[in-house]
From Swiss-Prot:
Homodimer. The RNAP catalytic core consists of 2 alpha, 1 beta, 1 beta' and 1 omega subunit. When a sigma factor is associated with the core the holoenzyme is formed, which can initiate transcription. Belongs to the RNA polymerase alpha chain family. Keywords: DNA-directed RNA polymerase, Nucleotidyltransferase, Transcription, Transferase. This is DNA-directed RNA polymerase subunit alpha. One of its GO terms (molecular function) is DNA-directed RNA polymerase activity. Its EC number is 2.7.7.6. DNA-dependent RNA polymerase catalyzes the transcription of DNA into RNA using the four ribonucleoside triphosphates as substrates. Signal peptide: none annotated. GO terms for biological process: DNA-templated transcription. CDD domains: RNAP_alpha_NTD.
Length: 342
């Protein structure tokens, strides 16, 4: 493989957001996330990828099958129950559940009429939380007894009823479709972002809504982690790469500008003060800082960042470089020698 120090510019020189702007609802089920600036086209790349992962790969809990006393299949009606079994199945599918168990759990609903039977009437079970207790399951007439058992599993995405049906189902077991995903809605839009005087950058705006079993912000974080994990297999090198050291080397094997002090750069007073306050003495110290690290420096803004990037570009340098064996043991002597030569 070619030198990593040369090719690292492929990813280290790309602009990245210093941080995300996240706005979360009080119940944490809705989040608006803004990432800017991004390289042109990266808004679509990231937004579409994260949306697909959010909707397909975040794990959750759902009912997989039910059994109702006196019912053999779903295409029937129950005496004293206003809804037929098909309607009850649809209502059960709408249950929003949170499970802290990886094993199948059983929920029991045992009720007597008359009246409206809700999810809150389901008997409490350890490790299972019902997030929409006001959901109506069915309506019972007077003197009607209704008993239903529901099996709850965990998984991801959508699983059809046929996949939830065991090979030898007990009499009266009705397998139902399971939508495990806790993510209800994901949308994104892309607009133009400004970076200095340039307007050819992307701003990614994502809105995520969940059923409450997971916060919208965490759902985005987990989807990004899934994406990262899948991409790792394509990276065929390790960081950092050791650079072979020559047996005899009287001169440094890096850009001599790295030995110059930052106060030799023609920077504004504000930028120079920020560098001094961060104890950045040599240009070699400066270029090893990432854009994010620089922007976290007190009083250091985008204007100062762009100013420094422009100066470094003129020296064929950039922020985020990796410089093996920096700083040299005799850096003060080497810097002085270079200054005399200049």
């Amino acid at each position: 493989m070619e030198s990593l120090n040369v090719n690292a510019k492929n990813w280290k020189a790309l602009i990245k957001p210093a941080q995300l702007d996240v706005k979360i609802s009080d119940d944490k089920s809705h989040a608006k996330i803004i990432a800017e600036p991004l390289e042109k086209g990266y808004g679509l790349t990231l937004g579409n990828s994260l949306r697909r992962i959010l909707l397909s790969s975040i794990r959750g809990a759902a009912v997989t099958s039910i059994q109702i006393d006196g019912v053999l299949h779903e295409f029937t009606s129950i005496k004293g129950v206003r809804e037929d079994v098909t309607d009850i199945v649809l209502n059960v599918k709408s249950l929003a559940l949170k499970s802290s168990s990886e094993t199948t759990k059983k929920l029991i609903l045992d009720a007597k009429g008359p009246g409206e039977i809700k999810a809150s009437d389901i008997a409490p079970v350890a490790d299972i939380e019902i997030l929409n207790p006001d959901l109506v399951i069915c309506n019972l007439d007077e003197n009607t007894h209704f008993h239903m058992e529901m099996n709850v599993g965990t998984g991801k995405g959508y699983v059809p009823a046929v996949m939830n049906k065991p090979e030898e189902p007990p009499l009266g077991l009705i397998a139902i479709d399971s939508l495990y995903s806790p993510v209800k809605k994901v949308s994104y839009s892309i607009s133009t972002a400004r970076e200095g005087k340039a307007l050819d950058y992307d701003k990614l705006i994502m809105e995520v809504e969940t059923n409450g079993s997971i916060s919208a912000e965490d759902a985005v974080a987990y989807s990004a982690r899934i994406f990262q994990d899948q991409l790792n297999m394509f990276v065929n090198f390790d960081e950092p790469v050791e650079v072979p050291v020559k047996e005899v080397s009287s001169e440094p094997e890096f850009n001599k500008n790295l030995l110059r002090k930052v106060d030799e750069l023609e920077l504004s007073v504000r930028s120079m003060n920020c560098l001094k306050n961060d104890n950045i003495i040599y240009i070699g110290d400066l270029v090893q800082k990432s854009e994010g690290e620089m922007l976290r420096t007190p009083n250091f803004g985008r204007k100062s960042l762009n100013e420094i990037k422009e100066v470094l570009t003129g020296m064929s340098l950039y922020l985020g470089m990796e410089i093996p064996n920096w700083p040299p043991e005799n850096i003060a002597e080497m810097s002085k020698k270079l200054e005399e030569q200049i």
